[in-house]
A protein has these predicted regions:
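Feature marking well-ordered beta-strand scaffolds used for ligand recognition
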Residues: 1-200
């Protein structure tokens, strides 16, 4: 509810949209990328199409401090990356990558064979290029699959229901109750660590 992620000529950026009418760029929340284009958010990662540099894996577990974990280019084979979509089948996660002049690429990101912690909440991806499909022209986009969610407009009103039926989505004022006090200030927690069983 509080963050928007964008790409521009400088790279991948995070905006604070606690007040959607007054979005603010978060200081220090920019990951420089030379060719940042479309991206996909999945759990604690942002996967960013980064042109000739391949696919950027950005840790967004703390959205106010995103960090580049790695750039993956499959030994130079991914060199015109324009867009990415992530999907899962059984215990494996895949990335469909529009790799421009090279066509459509399929990466196996997580599987029981290559990621021992594949059943965890957000396992560290270990990408492997497993397929290429040549396209008639440059592959510049990948159609977004059915994410089984609802589309809402800027005011929180439902505009579309995808693969399921049920209650309506929350309105803006209802969402704010999850992260704001009645006076408008944000709910916060103290960032503490445990060492030898004691909080520090």
């Amino acid at each position: 509810f509080r963050y928007a992620f964008v790409t521009d000529d400088e790279g991948f950026k995070v905006l604070d949209i606690t007040d959607p009418v007054k979005p603010k760029l978060i200081p220090g929340a920019t990951v420089p990328l030379k060719h940042a284009q479309r991206f996909y958010l999945a759990r604690t990662y942002a996967y960013v199409a980064d042109g000739e540099d391949g696919l950027a894996f950005i840790d967004i577990s703390n959205p106010e401090k995103p960090k580049l974990e790695r750039l993956y280019n499959a030994d130079g084979k991914l060199n015109d990356v324009r867009a990415v979509q992530i999907g899962s089948v059984n215990a494996s996660m895949f990335a469909l990558v529009a790799d421009g002049k090279n066509g459509l690429r399929v990466l196996q990101m997580i599987s029981p064979e290559n990621v021992p912690t594949h059943m965890g909440f957000s396992p560290v991806p270990n990408p492997k290029l497993i397929a290429t499909y040549p396209t008639h022209g440059p592959a510049v986009a990948v159609s977004r699959g059915l994410d089984r969610d609802r589309v809402v407009d800027e005011t929180g009103n439902q505009t579309v229901v995808f693969g399921r039926r049920g209650s309506r989505p929350f309105r803006q004022d209802e969402m704010e109750k999850f992260y704001k006090h009645a006076d408008g200030s944000l709910y916060t927690v103290e960032d503490v660590a445990a060492k030898s069983g004691e909080l520090k």
